[in-house]
Amino acid sequence: MKLQAVMETLIQRQQRARQELEARQAPPPPPPEPTGVRARTTMTDEDREPENARMHRTQMAALAAMRAAAAGLGHPSSPGGSEDGPPISGDEDTAREGTLSSPALHGSVLEGAGHAEGDRHLMDVGSDDDDTKSKWEEQELEELGEEEEEEEEEDDFEEEEEEEEGLGPPESASLGTAGLFTRKAPPAQAFRGDGGPRMLSGPERLGPGPAHPSHMASQMPPPDHGDWTFEEQFKQLYELDADPKRKEFLDDLFSFMQKRGTPVNRIPIMAKQVLDLFMLYVLVTEKGGLVEVINKKLWREITKGLNLPTSITSAAFTLRTQYMKYLYPYECERRGLSSPNELQAAIDSNRREGRRQSFGGSLFAYSPSGAHSMLPSPKLPVTPLGLAASTNGSSITPAPKIKKEEDSAIPITVPGRLPVSLAGHPVVAAQAAAVQAAAAQAAVAAQAAALEQLREKLESTEPPEKKMALVADEQQRLMQRAVQQSFLAMTAQLPMNIRINSQASESRQDSAVSLTSANGSNSISMSVEMNGIVYTGVLFAQPPPPTAPSAPGKGGVSSIGTNTTTGSRTGASGSTVSGGQVGLPGVSTPTMSSTSNNSLP
């Protein structure tokens, strides 16, 4: 209490001196300097200002009385009185007075003018007479080492107090030296954080891990840009396995990215574990590079190679983005497997396929070409022969080219109206040309409509049995069409004009071919006009005789021949002539039948 009363008296005198100086509007003093320099400058100032020196003599006398009282109290006086410890220099006393005056004056000493006055007192310490100065020197010799350290810490503490303007907890002001050291910890941490280019590069911002405490301890020495920094920051990545190539690769990768201007500032995490950049690079480059992996969709194999769980959603996208960010520039530089333009093209192509692809896993795939490439032209390649064919009152549904799993394309052809002209009849040729144009337009429209219907059917959720049955039906129609073309090829070698007509009652039908497979008694009823004579007959399919040699035919027809053909001339009127039977040996498909009338249009 006695010491506290002395200190309050001293503080009041300091306040009065400060008010007098403010009234005189004295210029602010220069920043604090070493004690010897301060003493010399302040003595020259006191020569010019004797009143200021006199005030400080009285203050220093009070300080001497305070030291005497403090010496009487001793060191272990009280826990809160650690400021009464061993006598130290006047610099520390004055600074501690500023600290002690903080709670009494509500922070007035810690703010602007208070700090200016404290600094002025620090500068004016050396202005005392020789006796007081020699006494201080003896005390300073006793605790020289401790004073130097505490003086630096006091300066730092006062600078921090100026910045914070007394916002710290007030209890620290009464803790003496211990309070100063506890308040010193945050500036030390800030100093460590301020320090280096390594903080600017950003790799220190790792999550808590086994390497974190040692890394924080290693920040105290000056930062180094050697490889050891990468080992410290990415210790988990380096220690995933004992492969010596791992360290070489990671060192090369990190130095390359640092020189490139895009340093690796964090460890990529996937599935709650460190993403192994080394293994990711090895797996992708073994597959041919990033572009090849994207085009061939090999991300599932990459995921398995990295021992990642297969249940990760969007694993391919995550791996691709991480590879592009951390490893793709390195791949382009070291391996040159692709270029950024190729990568962008692969990403765009993959994105378009993802929008277009259906995830139902259909058994059928459509050809990207239109209906014209899927369906043949209505014209038959018959050189001297003209043939007009149509269905027997109904149309056969056209089907597209079906591409099965073994990529064997089966062209499904559809017989439409196939009008061609006879070489020796110009009137028939003109009519056939007109019918051909109309039939071509109708065929195109029918093909488009049928193709759309078939696509809708195939895209619907039909069982695979129905789809396979549809394929079998189309194959059967294909074989029937092949038999018809084989017969026409045979008749093309004969010097005659042939008209194949159905028994339909339509008057404008030029010709027709009826192909049915409902029962086994199928036949073709036809009429042939040769030089004005009309021959009519019915063609039945006959099995090949066991001894008859079989010649290779078209579309499953082994051989085609005529058994008997009989007829009688009826004149130009075109009346019906009895006909015989024409057999088609070697036909292994359902039989064909057609009937014809005996009049020319």
UniProtKB/Swiss-Prot annotation:
<keyword id="KW-0010">Activator</keyword>
<keyword id="KW-0539">Nucleus</keyword>
<feature type="modified residue" description="Phosphothreonine">
    <location>
        <position position="99"/>
    </location>
</feature>
<dbReference type="GO" id="GO:0003677">
    <property type="term" value="F:DNA binding"/>
</dbReference>
<feature type="domain" description="REKLES">
    <location>
        <begin position="449"/>
        <end position="546"/>
    </location>
</feature>
<dbReference type="GO" id="GO:0045944">
    <property type="term" value="P:positive regulation of transcription by RNA polymerase II"/>
</dbReference>
<dbReference type="GO" id="GO:0003682">
    <property type="term" value="F:chromatin binding"/>
</dbReference>
<feature type="region of interest" description="Acidic">
    <location>
        <begin position="128"/>
        <end position="165"/>
    </location>
</feature>
<keyword id="KW-0805">Transcription regulation</keyword>
<dbReference type="InterPro" id="IPR036431">
    <property type="entry name" value="ARID_dom_sf"/>
</dbReference>
<feature type="modified residue" description="Phosphoserine">
    <location>
        <position position="127"/>
    </location>
</feature>
<dbReference type="GO" id="GO:0045121">
    <property type="term" value="C:membrane raft"/>
</dbReference>
<keyword id="KW-0238">DNA-binding</keyword>
<feature type="compositionally biased region" description="Basic and acidic residues">
    <location>
        <begin position="114"/>
        <end position="123"/>
    </location>
</feature>
<feature type="compositionally biased region" description="Acidic residues">
    <location>
        <begin position="139"/>
        <end position="166"/>
    </location>
</feature>
<dbReference type="GO" id="GO:0005829">
    <property type="term" value="C:cytosol"/>
</dbReference>
<keyword id="KW-0804">Transcription</keyword>
<feature type="compositionally biased region" description="Low complexity">
    <location>
        <begin position="588"/>
        <end position="601"/>
    </location>
</feature>
<dbReference type="InterPro" id="IPR001606">
    <property type="entry name" value="ARID_dom"/>
</dbReference>
<feature type="cross-link" description="Glycyl lysine isopeptide (Lys-Gly) (interchain with G-Cter in SUMO2)">
    <location>
        <position position="404"/>
    </location>
</feature>
<feature type="region of interest" description="Important for cytoplasmic localization">
    <location>
        <begin position="542"/>
        <end position="562"/>
    </location>
</feature>
<feature type="region of interest" description="Important for nuclear localization">
    <location>
        <begin position="450"/>
        <end position="493"/>
    </location>
</feature>
<feature type="compositionally biased region" description="Low complexity">
    <location>
        <begin position="559"/>
        <end position="579"/>
    </location>
</feature>
<feature type="modified residue" description="Phosphoserine">
    <location>
        <position position="102"/>
    </location>
</feature>
<feature type="modified residue" description="Phosphoserine">
    <location>
        <position position="358"/>
    </location>
</feature>
<feature type="modified residue" description="Phosphoserine">
    <location>
        <position position="367"/>
    </location>
</feature>
<dbReference type="GO" id="GO:0005634">
    <property type="term" value="C:nucleus"/>
</dbReference>
<dbReference type="Pfam" id="PF01388">
    <property type="entry name" value="ARID"/>
</dbReference>
<dbReference type="GO" id="GO:0042802">
    <property type="term" value="F:identical protein binding"/>
</dbReference>
<dbReference type="InterPro" id="IPR045147">
    <property type="entry name" value="ARI3A/B/C"/>
</dbReference>
<feature type="domain" description="ARID">
    <location>
        <begin position="243"/>
        <end position="335"/>
    </location>
</feature>
<keyword id="KW-0832">Ubl conjugation</keyword>
<dbReference type="InterPro" id="IPR023334">
    <property type="entry name" value="REKLES_domain"/>
</dbReference>
<feature type="compositionally biased region" description="Low complexity">
    <location>
        <begin position="60"/>
        <end position="89"/>
    </location>
</feature>
<feature type="cross-link" description="Glycyl lysine isopeptide (Lys-Gly) (interchain with G-Cter in SUMO2)">
    <location>
        <position position="457"/>
    </location>
</feature>
<comment type="function">
    <text>Transcription factor involved in B-cell differentiation. Binds a VH promoter proximal site necessary for induced mu-heavy-chain transcription. Binds the minor groove of a restricted ATC sequence that is sufficient for nuclear matrix association. This sequence motif is present in matrix-associating regions (MARS) proximal to the promoter and flanking E mu. Activates E mu-driven transcription by binding these sites. May be involved in the control of cell cycle progression by the RB1/E2F1 pathway.</text>
</comment>
<feature type="region of interest" description="Homodimerization">
    <location>
        <begin position="495"/>
        <end position="518"/>
    </location>
</feature>
<keyword id="KW-0963">Cytoplasm</keyword>
<feature type="region of interest" description="Disordered">
    <location>
        <begin position="545"/>
        <end position="601"/>
    </location>
</feature>
<dbReference type="GO" id="GO:0005654">
    <property type="term" value="C:nucleoplasm"/>
</dbReference>
<feature type="cross-link" description="Glycyl lysine isopeptide (Lys-Gly) (interchain with G-Cter in SUMO2)">
    <location>
        <position position="467"/>
    </location>
</feature>
<feature type="modified residue" description="Phosphoserine">
    <location>
        <position position="78"/>
    </location>
</feature>
